[in-house]
Design a protein with these regions (language model features):
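Core AdoMet radical
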Residues: 94-105, 118-133, 144-164, 175-207, ...
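Hydrophobic positions in alpha-helices of CheY-like receiver
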Residues: 140-144, 171, 210-214, 241
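Catalytic cores of alpha/beta
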Residues: 169, 228-244
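Short, hinge-like loop/turn segments at secondary-structure boundaries
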Residues: 170-174, 199-201, 239-241
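A structural signal for the main folded, soluble domain(s) of proteins
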Residues: 54, 81, 85-88, 95-96, ...
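Canonical Radical SAM [4Fe-4S] cluster-binding loop centered on the CxxxCxxC motif
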Residues: 70-106
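Alpha-helical scaffolding within the catalytic cores
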Residues: 164-170
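Flexible, acidic/Gly-rich N-terminal and inter-domain linker regions that tether
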Residues: 1-76
């Protein structure tokens, strides 16, 4: 983990060198000659990355010599992928689950939290199923509480993990003032929901998880994705949610 000076012009580079920055990231399509003047780390990326700005967080893969943008300070819509694994197999999913060991992502995010601007208004965690490695993810959320306490945190989850009281209690014990679980309920009847997520028993686990969260005073947002299988039942689903889950929370 390191801080980089961001440079776009020769003057930017000279100022960074004069200020003794140990690392410089240059957005340029030309050759950079700093021979004899700079002994630190110099990285150059082409102009298509001109969107990078002060306070952004990027992650480097030294093997592939590629980088990913994890966080953009000037964006109001920052989402961090937790995992590509999931125990639902939603028929309309734009990112089907992968059976891969990607637990390293959680470690990367934990290291990134101190770099995120404390004035960030909102941050979303998504997957895969964000609670696949729930203990490590709880540690990430605890880090959010400690490093960016004023930032509203939204977690996209299928909610099934919350059927486990141990997980719900760990979530509650974070005591984050603005933590929200965003959980989809695709239908008011079990077999339709389970068919859509391709997981028998998912509806019962999801509803039980929602009830346990609310029993512990936690914030829950309900989501319904409209498509060919859910749209015909949307009125019935809406009435069922209003009748049976009137205590859920409005979205951010």
């Amino acid at each position: 983990m390191a801080d980089f000076a961001l440079a776009r012009t020769p003057d930017d580079i000279r100022h960074a060198v004069a200020a003794a920055w140990p690392s410089i990231l240059v957005v340029s399509n030309g050759a950079i000659d700093l021979s004899g003047r700079f002994a630190g780390r110099l990285l150059t990326v082409p102009p298509r990355y001109d969107y990078l700005g002060e306070g952004d967080v990027i992650a480097f893969d030294h093997t592939s010599r590629k980088f990913r943008t994890l966080y953009r300070r000037n964006s109001a819509h920052n989402s961090l992928l937790i995992t590509e694994r999931c125990n639902n197999y939603c028929m309309m999913c734009s990112q089907p689950p992968k059976n891969v060991d990607d637990r390293w992502i959680l470690g990367e995010i934990k290291e990134s939290l101190p770099l995120i601007d404390r004035e960030t208004q909102a941050l979303t965690f998504t997957g895969g199923e964000t609670l696949s490695d729930w203990e490590d993810f709880i540690a990430v959320l605890t880090g959010c509480r400690d490093w960016i306490p004023a930032t509203a945190i939204q977690v996209l989850t299928n909610g099934r993990a919350f059927a486990n009281s141990r997980i719900v209690d760990a979530w509650k014990d974070i005591s984050h003032p603005a933590l929200m679980a965003a959980i989809p309920v695709y239908a008011s009847v079990e077999y339709v929901h389970d068919h859509i997520v391709q997981a028998k028993g998912a509806f019962d686990e999801t509803i039980l998880g929602i009830l346990k969260l609310k029993d512990r005073g936690q914030r829950v947002e309900i989501r319904v994705v409209l498509h060919a299988l859910t749209a015909p039942f949307i009125e019935e689903t809406g009435r069922w949610l209003a009748r049976n889950l009137p205590f859920v929370d409005p979205s951010h």
